[in-house]
């Protein structure tokens, strides 16, 4: 008997009935920039699901719309404690996962491709991996376009001016092709963090306090 993940994800997705489409505006914060994986690297469960969704959206000619919804859903997960707890709930059976995920996707107004894809994820009891799968889709897209993926974390949502200034500073540092993801993190207290690969740029108040505490311990 094949396991829950031994399936052609693209063919399974295509058998689901379509639903209505819509967009969700995303406003997130906190900066982490990570080097994208090699395009040819498809190891791991999340990467396989990510590739299936990316290829399906490309074949159907609505990749741009799907990527926008992927970013919006990833942002919603990052910003909602309740949503993260729901996705991580191992007690939920397949029927419950499918029902609640359908309600969630309808409420957020996503299109049929992403909605059916999340349905497959729920059917296979892989909702705890959803955030990683969405990250994989965005990383794959950035890799194909020769970009570096930047995840931004800040205590407050970035303004358009702050976002433009950050992109300019990253370009000055040699990162001219950067795709940013943004998340809010109140624990930073103020400022932001930016990670590029193994390099962390930390201007947050929390980071400054930590460095001060470490310096005081070293001087003791």
Curated annotation (Swiss-Prot):
One of its GO terms (cellular component) is proton-transporting ATP synthase complex. It comes from the Bacteria. Its main location: membrane. Pfam families: OSCP. Keywords: ATP synthesis, Cell inner membrane, Cell membrane, CF(1), Hydrogen ion transport, Ion transport, Membrane, Transport. It is a peripheral membrane protein. F(1)F(0) ATP synthase produces ATP from ADP in the presence of a proton or sodium gradient. F-type ATPases consist of two structural domains, F(1) containing the extramembraneous catalytic core and F(0) containing the membrane proton channel, linked together by a central stalk and a peripheral stalk. During catalysis, ATP synthesis in the catalytic domain of F(1) is coupled via a rotary mechanism of the central stalk subunits to proton translocation. This protein is part of the stalk that links CF(0) to CF(1). It either transmits conformational changes from CF(0) to CF(1) or is implicated in proton conduction. HAMAP family: ATP_synth_delta_bact. This is ATP synthase subunit delta. The gene is atpH.
């Amino acid at each position: 008997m094949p396991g829950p993940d031994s399936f052609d994800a693209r063919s399974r997705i295509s058998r689901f009935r379509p639903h209505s489409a819509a967009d969700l505006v995303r406003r997130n914060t906190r900066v982490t920039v990570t080097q994208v994986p090699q395009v040819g690297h498809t190891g791991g469960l999340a990467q396989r699901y990510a590739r299936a969704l990316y290829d399906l959206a490309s074949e159907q000619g609505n990749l741009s719309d799907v990527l926008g919804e992927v970013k919006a859903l990833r942002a919603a997960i990052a910003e909602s404690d309740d949503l993260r707890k729901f996705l991580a709930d191992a007690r939920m059976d397949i029927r419950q996962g499918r029902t609640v995920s359908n309600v969630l996707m309808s409420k957020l107004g996503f299109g049929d491709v992403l909605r059916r894809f999340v349905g497959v994820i729920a059917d296979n009891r892989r909702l705890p991996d959803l955030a990683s799968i969405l990250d994989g889709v965005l990383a794959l897209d950035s890799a194909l376009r020769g970009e570096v993926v930047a995840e931004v974390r800040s205590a407050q949502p970035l303004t358009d001016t702050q976002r433009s200034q950050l992109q300019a500073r990253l370009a000055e540092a040699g990162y001219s092709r950067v795709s940013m993801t943004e998340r809010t993190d109140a624990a930073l207290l103020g400022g932001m963090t930016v990670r590029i690969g193994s390099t962390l740029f930390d201007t947050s108040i929390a980071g400054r306090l930590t460095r001060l505490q470490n310096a005081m311990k070293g001087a003791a």
